Design a protein with these regions (language model features):
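Gly/Pro-rich hinge or "lid" segments in bacterial periplasmic/extracellular proteins
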Residues: 146-201, 207-210, 315, 319, ...
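N-terminal lobe/hinge region of extracytoplasmic solute-binding protein
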Residues: 32-81, 111, 175
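Detector for C-terminal structural segments
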Residues: 186, 275-303, 340-350, 374-484
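Surface-exposed binding/hinge segments that line
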Residues: 87, 121-164
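Aromatic- and charge-enriched surface segment that lines or borders ligand/interaction sites
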Residues: 52, 75-118, 214, 262
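Ligand/substrate-recognition segments at binding pockets and active sites
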Residues: 322-388
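Local pocket/hinge segments that shape ligand/substrate recognition
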Residues: 199-202, 224-314, 337, 407-417, ...
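Ligand-site clamp/hinge motif
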Residues: 187-233, 359
């Protein structure tokens, strides 16, 4: 297979030997697998949108590398378990329309999200009782009840109040106060770095082989993630390409529909978990920085619990399948995107499940349709990756019975009174270990791995850092040297 891939790759290179390249173009051309779906941070829910919005907008608070909350905009005091007072810091950033971020913008953004049931962020702030402006520099937030992780929920992009009041279309023309401003164009996604005018152009190239090919031909300057291991290995051996990598904290997983007559049986979910040889998949198809996962958060996160490893056990899986359906195979449908690498993983999982008596049909969809189906609960099984999660309250949003969309992220309609009660207790104690263990016992989802991060770029590129959560913050300091 690797020999065939290399031959095909070299053949494709020969076809484009005379293709134009961007080596004299000052813009950095960033090849991405999926383009952002929504550049309004109040409504964005896909990974590409969140990564790009993080460049365009300034957040009230953000997570540092130790998963602690920091803010360049405000300091705060906890007056009581339900009252917080915030004070503006000096040297606040300017919005890209020229106005300076102020207290009106913060309050307007929060009030707008609270009042809009269509925003996925609204659930984060349902516990806010009221916001009170104390002065031009200070404001208070009063909660309905105590929330030990409330500050972590304030990781929200601030929008200009004047544009909010005018119903500005932030999705089509985002205006933030981050390190990059959006450059309106008819058919391209371009950002300009405020401090020096460096332009980043984001180019959607869905096929990873084509993405790597364009990198070799200098039609693009850099790619990050979403590359099969054979492509990574090939690029590592190219003298014109530099590679940087790190461990990852984003979890790839399989989701289930718990309204399904078959998948609501925990025995079937257990059988599926034991039938998939994750170790083999990681060893042969993912990069060396990928780690097996048993829970949402990676081991370095403070909320991570000590769990027993789910072992590959096809014999026990077969026995469970026979106990459920002794006379015939079980038929299920698995949805995934058209990305060739994700399709390859799905095909291997299909073959592994066939060995234990599960007939898995793979249905591929374009990214927009696929993600819409997931959001609407239109699936039996699906494969996806949670990106950038850091607040343990995510467990409530994914697994509480009242968190069915649009009130939360429980897209599989998971319902467990025991877990509901454990979640309620964890929200108060901030001890999530019992919740995490019970979710594993019930196979509330099937964790696969924390996929390692890798960036490949031409020698013209320097100062790009890869982050554990796969964000694009490395673009804040990236440099392109046209004289290379």
């Amino acid at each position: 297979m690797k020999v065939k891939f290399l031959s095909l790759f070299l053949f494709l290179i020969s076809l484009t030997a005379c293709s134009p390249n961007n080596q004299n173009d000052k813009a950095v051309h960033f090849g991405i697998a999926q383009k952002p779906q929504n550049l309004d941070p109040r409504f964005a829910s896909d990974a590409a949108s969140e990564k790009m919005n993080n460049l365009i907008y300034s957040s009230l608070f953000y997570f540092d590398n130790n998963f602690k909350m920091q803010s360049d905009i405000v300091s705060y005091q906890i007056i009581s378990s339900t009252e917080y007072v915030f004070e503006l810091k000096e040297d606040l950033p300017y919005f890209h329309n020229g106005s300076r971020l102020n207290i009106k913008d913060i309050i307007a953004t929060l009030e707008n999200v609270i009042s809009d049931p269509m925003s996925p962020l609204a659930v984060e702030f349902k516990n806010i009782d009221k916001l009170v402006k104390i002065s031009h520099e200070r404001f208070s937030i009063f909660l309905k009840e105590a929330d030990i992780n409330f500050i972590q929920k304030l990781n929200i992009a601030i929008l200009p109040s004047a544009l909010i009041n005018n119903n500005h279309n932030f999705s089509m023309n985002p205006v933030g106060s981050g390190m990059f401003r959006y450059i309106p164009t008819s058919n391209k996604i371009r950002l300009e770095r405020i401090k020096d005018g460096q332009v980043i152009e984001f180019i959607e190239i869905k096929d990873p082989t084509v993405r790597a090919l364009k990198l070799l031909k200098r039609e693009i300057d850099i790619v990050q993630n979403d590359l099969p291991i054979e492509v990574v290995n090939f690029l590592e051996n190219q003298s014109s390409i530099s590679i940087s990598s790190t461990i990852g904290s984003n979890i790839s997983y399989i989701g289930f529909n718990f309204n399904d007559s078959l998948l609501k049986d925990v025995r079937l979910r257990q059988a599926i978990a034991m039938a998939i040889n994750r170790e083999e998949l990681v060893q042969y198809f993912l990069d060396e920085n990928t780690r097996l996962a048993e829970q949402l958060f990676a081991p370095e996160h403070w909320v991570s619990a000590n769990l027993v490893h789910t072992s590959f056990n096809p014999e026990q899986s077969r026995n469970l399948i026979k106990s459920i359906s002794p006379l015939s195979p079980i038929s299920l449908t698995y949805k995934t995107s058209t990305d060739p690498f994700r399709l390859k993983i799905a095909t291997i999982i299909q073959n592994q499940l066939a060995q234990v008596g599960i007939d898995l049909t793979i249905k591929t969809l374009d990214w927009g349709t696929y993600f819409q189906d997931i959001q609407n609960g239109n699936f039996q099984m699906y494969g996806l990756t949670w990106v950038g999660i850091k607040n343990p309250d995510i467990y409530y949003k994914i697994f509480h019975s009242k968190s069915i969309p649009p009130k939360g992220l429980n897209r599989g309609y998971f319902k467990s009174l025991k877990i509901d009660n454990l979640l309620k207790s964890s929200l108060t104690s901030n001890d999530w270990s019992a919740v995490i263990l019970e979710i594993q016992n019930q196979v509330g989802f099937l964790p696969l791995w924390y996929e390692g991060n890798i960036a490949a770029h031409t020698k013209q590129i320097s100062n790009y850092k890869v982050h554990n959560d796969g964000n694009w913050d490395g673009l804040k300091n990236i440099r392109k040297h046209n004289d290379y």
